[in-house]
UniProtKB/Swiss-Prot annotation:
Its EC number is 3.4.24.34. It comes from Rattus norvegicus. Belongs to the peptidase M10A family. This is Neutrophil collagenase. One of its GO terms (molecular function) is peptidase activity. The gene is Mmp8. A motif (Cysteine switch) lies at residues 90-97. Pfam families: Hemopexin, Peptidase_M10, PG_binding_1. It is an enzyme of class 3 (hydrolase). Its main location: cytoplasm. Residues 21-101 form a propeptide.
Length: 466
């Protein structure tokens, strides 16, 4: 913040007062409505140039419900905080409903040996790097299908790839950095199949800004005839989310889509991909859970659910979207309230986070806590009243946060420390005067005052499942 020592006190006072005041609710409501209307025009075919009226308000509410349904949000028909949060995420420019600049006929190539041409390049990457990422993006789609892709350096190609900006002649202008990243057209002649990338974005090969491979692979899905998916783990989900390219495999939802259009590959063994966990799966079990500054995080494979206590909403995200340096399949986690840190564990390694930032010197080995080599992984962990409890198989270890060493008498059986908890623990966190233990599809509420289990229920009740 600028220091205004030379300015008159009165001006300084008014400046500080203005910046300290919250945005008036009516201004915020108007801003959110404009954001919503603009978004719905682009992606849900809300007619343009609509003046405010009761009829148009009803149309906007219906379009909002359609958008909320697509993203798995409560269908309020209002531009609430959760809806605006989704709308402000960077994404693909192809609409989520209807067709994108209709091309005649069925959105499917009649031949499977497709050609592509890279018209120009982004200045942030070398030509060789762009070529490599584009090749990888096409390979993602060729492995599970009968499609092949060959680059041509001149002449006509089925799919033309270009980096362009703003209004570039296809009636679908880009909007500058961090909005619409790219778009592509369904199969057909002329512009059909072509993919355009916003040249004002910063394109990379890693987790910084926008990974070209991930965005290109998504857009080429449109070039092949796929529409957007409601599965948040699918490549064809409209919003951008970083995933580690070196270990990336096409999700099952996308495999099913491309094979529906073009059939399976000729390989005797068909590839399978990861599936997105379903919150209300009756067999769902968490890998880890922790609190973080009032929110609750439930980890599963490469995903986590985030529960907002105030909003009463739960959203599913990629771990890599928030913490690109963390591995998938985390096994334990806990929040140290005194140090305002969250610790996450996998195997014998652990990481320390301050909100979304990795602390220096991590990952470290769990031997720092005093674990012997015989302990190869931690099942769950929770910190309370200066002690951290670690759960390994049927044993409980207790660590003193001040002395930074294990307490005498530990490890001991979990049931001897927490009567009624007679099972292996998958995840645990503390809320009020309770430890919430998760084991398989159930959770146990253990009262820390009465020292007994007071409730046993389904784990996914925490994900708002009926």
């Amino acid at each position: 913040m600028l220091h205004l020592k030379t300015l008159p006190f009165l001006f300084f006072f008014h400046t500080q007062l203005a910046t300290a005041l919250p945005v008036p609710p009516e201004h915020l409501e108007e801003k959110n409505m404009k954001t919503a209307e603009n978004y719905l025009r682009k992606f849900y075919h809300l007619p343009s140039n609509q003046f405010r009226s009761a009829r148009n308000a009803t149309m906007i509410a219906e379009k909002l419900k359609e958008m909320q349904r697509f993203f798995g949000l409560p269908e309020t028909g209002k531009p609430d905080a959760a809806t605006i949060e989704i709308m402000e995420k960077p994404r693909c420019g192809v609409p989520d409903s209807g067709d994108f600049l209709l091309t005649p006929g069925s959105p499917k190539w009649t031949h499977t040996n497709l050609t592509y041409r890279i018209i120009n390049h982004t200045p942030q990457m070398s030509k060789a790097e762009v070529k490599t990422e584009i090749e990888k993006a096409f390979k993602i789609w060729s492995v599970p299908s009968t499609l092949t892709f060959t680059e041509t350096l001149e002449g006509e190609a089925d799919i033309n790839i270009a980096f362009v900006s703003r209004d570039h002649g296809d009636n679908s202008p880009f909007d500058g950095p961090n909005g619409i990243l790219a778009h592509a057209f369904q199969p057909g002649r002329g512009i059909g199949g072509d993919a355009h990338f916003d040249s004002e974005e910063t394109w990379t090969q890693d987790s910084k800004n926008y990974n070209l491979f991930l965005v290109a692979a998504h857009e080429f899905g449109h070039s092949l005839g796929l529409s957007h998916s409601t599965d948040p783990g699918a490549l064809m989900y409209p919003n951008y989310a970083y995933r580690e390219p070196s270990t990336y495999s096409l999700p099952q939802d996308d495999i099913n889509g491309i094979q529906t259009i073009y059939g399976p590959s000729d390989n005797p063994v068909q590839p399978t991909g990861p599936s997105t966990p379903t919150a209300c799966d009756p067999h769902l079990r968490f890998d880890a859970a922790t609190t973080l500054r009032g929110e609750i995080y439930f980890f599963k494979d490469k995903y986590f659910w985030r529960r907002h206590p105030q909003l009463r909403t739960v959203d599913l995200n990629f771990i890599s979207l928030f913490w690109p340096f963390l591995p998938n399949g985390l096994q334990a986690a806990y929040e140290d309230f005194d140090r305002d840190l969250v610790f996450l564990f996998k195997g014998r390694q652990y990481w320390a986070l301050s909100a979304y930032d990795l602390q220096q010197g991590y990952p470290r080995d769990i031997s720092n806590y005093g674990f012997p080599r015989s302990v190869q992984a931690i099942d769950a962990a929770v910190s309370y009243n200066g002690k951290t409890y670690f759960f390994v198989n049927n044993q409980c270890w207790r660590y003193d946060n001040q002395r930074r060493s294990m307490d005498p008498g530990y490890p001991t059986s979990i049931a001897s420390v927490f009567p009624g908890i007679n099972c292996r623990i998958d995840a645990v966190f503390q809320q009020d005067s309770f430890f919430l233990f998760f084991s398989g599809p159930q959770y146990f509420a253990f009262n820390l005052v009465s020292r007994r289990v007071t409730r046993v229920a389904r784990s996914n009740l925490w994900l708002n499942c009926p």
